[in-house]
């Protein structure tokens, strides 16, 4: 699993160009992925939500727009990323480690994490901590990269390992940060492996929905 100090430093170095780079590398699909998540959350009509590993606040902003009556708190252990989230209009930000969230049990209707769990040092510990702060009847939603199981698998792996690091390096000046990405996606539990992990960490009725041919997957677990 990733080294926390490396991950924090890597994201601090690319914070200034993170949003633009994501849009380019995904050909804009990241905007749609977050729209799917925020639309699902809107249907639950939450009043208090925690967006873990919020980074520059892309998902938090989408949720603020779709759920104007909800208090959205964006947390991340990289202060440099959250500085950009605040500048972009995220109302509430908090520097916090997902492995030790500074909230009482049952504090939130929904906890969300987009493209963040994969970078955490201990997936089960992070999931247990997120589950802890969700109210009974609440929900955890996770959006993260995955490997397609169809004909896209081979070309996608080629893109991850051969094209993306060079393109991202040109955009950010930090190719090494994105060389780590492909390996982290391949090592990340996906599909039924992830839903099994969610249920072992105190969540019920875990499910997953592949998006864009399985390039990313949306997971849900209920408390």
What do the predicted segments below correspond to?
Residues 1-19:
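N-terminal, positively charged/glycine-rich alpha-helical extensions of SAM-dependent methyltransferases
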Residues 27-46:
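Conserved alpha-helix/loop element of class I SAM-dependent methyltransferases that forms part
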Residues 48-100:
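Class I SAM-dependent methyltransferase SAM/SAH-binding core
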Residues 99-110:
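A short acidic, Gly/Pro-enriched loop at the edge of an enzyme's catalytic core
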Residues 109-123:
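A short SAM/SAH-binding and catalytic strip from SAM-dependent methyltransferases
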Residues 124-139:
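A short glycine-rich, Lys/Arg-flanked "PGG" loop and its adjoining helix->strand segment in the class I
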Residues 143, 147-197, 207:
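C-terminal alpha-helical "lid/dimerization" subdomain adjacent to the S-adenosyl-L-methionine
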Residues 204-223:
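Core SAM-dependent methyltransferase catalytic element
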């Amino acid at each position: 699993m990733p080294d926390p100090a490396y991950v924090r430093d890597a994201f601090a170095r690319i914070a200034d160009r993170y949003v633009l780079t994501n849009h380019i590398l995904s050909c804009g699909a990241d905007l749609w992925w977050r729209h799917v998540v925020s639309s699902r959350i809107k249907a639950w009509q939450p009043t208090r939500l925690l967006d873990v590993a919020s980074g520059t606040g892309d998902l938090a902003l989408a949720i603020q727009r779709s759920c104007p009556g909800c208090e959205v708190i964006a947390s991340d252990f990289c202060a440099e990323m959250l500085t950009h989230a605040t500048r972009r209009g995220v109302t509430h930000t908090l520097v916090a480690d997902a492995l030790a969230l500074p909230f009482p049990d049952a504090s939130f209707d929904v906890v969300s994490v987009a493209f963040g769990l994969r970078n955490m040092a201990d997936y089960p510990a992070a999931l247990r901590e997120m589950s802890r702060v969700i109210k009974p009847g609440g929900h955890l939603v996770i959006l993260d990269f995955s490997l397609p199981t169809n004909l896209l698998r081979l070309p996608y792996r080629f893109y991850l390992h051969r094209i993306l690091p060079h393109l991202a390096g040109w955009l950010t000046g930090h190719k090494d940060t994105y060389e780590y990405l492909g390996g982290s996606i391949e090592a990340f539990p996906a599909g039924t492996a992830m839903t099994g992990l969610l249920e072992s960490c105190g969540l019920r009725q875990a499910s997953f929905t592949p998006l864009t041919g399985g390039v990313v997957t949306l997971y849900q677990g209920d408390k």
